[in-house]
């Protein structure tokens, strides 16, 4: 099922997972509507929800591997994975820059694995380069290719409350 927890609740739930032998968790944010913008800039706020959650989990459960989601849809007011122009076109290259900033912010907080779930061209190579430039060669990048064709995609969008809205025009 789909669950949302406060930071304290997350720490407790991850502790229960650890006790069951689970050694990796994936974090997805439910961003407050007031923090969502057209460019999704909250995604790379190092004081934001996901970096705070990572740091807290690493303090309390240092052996737990933490995977994070990299995409703009939880942070954008239109629910899209990328920055959208006034003409309704997703701006690939501009979006990739933000995804790199997001991945680096998550790595700085202690993420072990980065999972780009957006659909921007060239983002994996760009994220790898950005992580390496910041000294995070050890942070892995994992693929999401199977999720979109699975029963997990609907609940994922529901959990994030980020179904994309139609472009204007």
List each model region and its residues.
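Alpha/beta enzyme core
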Residues: 1-169
């Amino acid at each position: 099922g789909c669950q949302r927890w406060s930071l304290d609740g997350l720490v407790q739930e991850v502790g229960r997972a650890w006790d069951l032998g689970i050694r990796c968790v994936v974090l997805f944010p439910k961003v407050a509507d007031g923090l969502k913008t057209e460019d999704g800039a909250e995604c790379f706020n190092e004081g934001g929800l996901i970096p705070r959650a990572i740091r807290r989990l690493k303090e309390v459960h240092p052996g737990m591997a933490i995977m994070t989601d990299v995409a703009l849809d939880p942070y954008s007011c239109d629910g899209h994975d990328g920055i959208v122009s006034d003409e309704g076109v997703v701006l690939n290259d501009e979006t990739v820059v933000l995804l790199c900033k997001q991945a680096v912010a998550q790595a700085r907080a202690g993420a072990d694995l980065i999972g780009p779930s957006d659909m921007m061209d060239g983002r994996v190579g760009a994220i790898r380069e950005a992580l390496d430039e910041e000294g995070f060669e050890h942070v892995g990048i994992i693929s999401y290719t199977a999720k979109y064709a699975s029963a997990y995609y609907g609940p994922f969008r529901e959990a994030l409350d980020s179904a994309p809205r139609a472009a204007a025009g």
